């Protein structure tokens, strides 16, 4: 890459501040990562990527009705033997983030590019985290995701979810937690070093509620469908994006999610009425 998205957009903005538009033939959240100086695992980083141009058809396994489990030999020992295989499909959807350009910023090409690269693209990465977790097409929206209630200690709940994954012959490859639980329940305990030694990745994001965690075999169970195209442009944002109306700059990528194995993801949830409260 010879120039950053911010540098490319500055050229277009200088020529036409009201209608600037730059298209990219790659996904800018993948190709340019402003967090590289401050390493932090995004949800995208947990997933293998599959290029996609349109609707993608893929194989998927689901848990069967309880009435069918008894007919499978050694169903308790090898739970995955009971899973039912079929086909599913997923499309690409836009993921967008917005900023407004401060007056006078365009006079400084370096500062302008930095603002796009380190503010707009960071917000786009946040929007991507949201889309892949609790968005309409995210993992948490899948009807076959298993909810795993826990009582008491957060770390004990996380380890229980890891155990559930390995009891179906998979690996606790990664988890998504809220920063609150990372700092208050995980940092300062041996659990982070032990999970790292096991090869378990941890993404921390506000898109998972405090006290909750999404634990799964991300490497095997899902694929990020990457449209391989992006755009940064000047546009009127939807109502409610900012406190006042007026044009802004939007960054957009096109992505989807193929959840091959919803059986391999566990959403750990606290039993609130048993006494769990944020510190």
Model-derived features with residue positions:
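Short conserved micro-motifs at the rims of enzyme active sites and ligand-binding pockets
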Residues: 69-71, 111, 186-189, 214, ...
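Alpha-helical scaffold segments that mediate packing/assembly in large oligomeric complexes
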Residues: 78-168, 266-279
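Short, Φ-rich (hydrophobic/aromatic) sequence segments
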Residues: 28-37, 112-124, 128, 208, ...
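Short loop/turn segments at secondary-structure transitions that flank enzyme active sites
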Residues: 64-67, 105, 126, 130, ...
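Hydrophobic side chains in beta-strands
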Residues: 60-61, 101, 177, 251
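Extended oligomerization regions of viral-like shell subunits
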Residues: 137-255, 272-279
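Assembly/oligomerization interface modules of large self-assembling protein complexes
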Residues: 6-95, 154
């Amino acid at each position: 890459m010879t120039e950053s998205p911010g540098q490319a957009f500055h050229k277009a903005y200088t020529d036409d501040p009201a209608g600037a538009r730059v298209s990219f033939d790659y996904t800018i959240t993948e190709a340019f990562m402003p967090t590289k100086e401050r390493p932090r695992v995004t949800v995208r980083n947990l997933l293998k990527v599959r290029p996609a141009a349109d609707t993608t058809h893929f194989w998927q396994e689901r848990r069967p009705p309880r009435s069918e489990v008894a007919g499978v030999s050694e169903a308790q020992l090898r739970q995955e033997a009971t899973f039912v295989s079929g086909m599913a499909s997923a499309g690409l959807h836009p993921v967008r983030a917005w900023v407004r350009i401060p007056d006078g910023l365009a006079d400084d090409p370096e500062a302008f590019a930095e603002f796009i690269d380190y503010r707009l693209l960071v917000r786009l990465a946040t929007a991507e985290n949201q889309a892949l977790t609790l968005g309409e097409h995210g993992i948490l929206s899948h009807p076959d995701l298993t909810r795993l209630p826990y009582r008491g200690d957060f770390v004990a709940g996380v380890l229980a979810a890891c155990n559930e994954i390995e009891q179906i012959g998979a690996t606790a490859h990664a988890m998504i937690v809220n920063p609150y639980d990372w700092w208050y329940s995980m940092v300062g305990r041996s659990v982070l070093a032990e999970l790292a030694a096991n090869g378990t990745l941890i993404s921390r994001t506000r898109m998972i509620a405090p006290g909750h965690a999404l634990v799964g075999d991300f490497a095997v169970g899902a694929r990020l469908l990457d449209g391989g195209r992006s755009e940064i442009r000047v546009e009127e944002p939807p109502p409610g994006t900012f406190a006042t109306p007026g044009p802004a700059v939007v960054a957009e990528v096109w992505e989807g999610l193929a959840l091959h194995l919803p059986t391999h993801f566990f959403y750990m949830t606290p039993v609130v009425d048993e006494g769990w409260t944020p510190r």
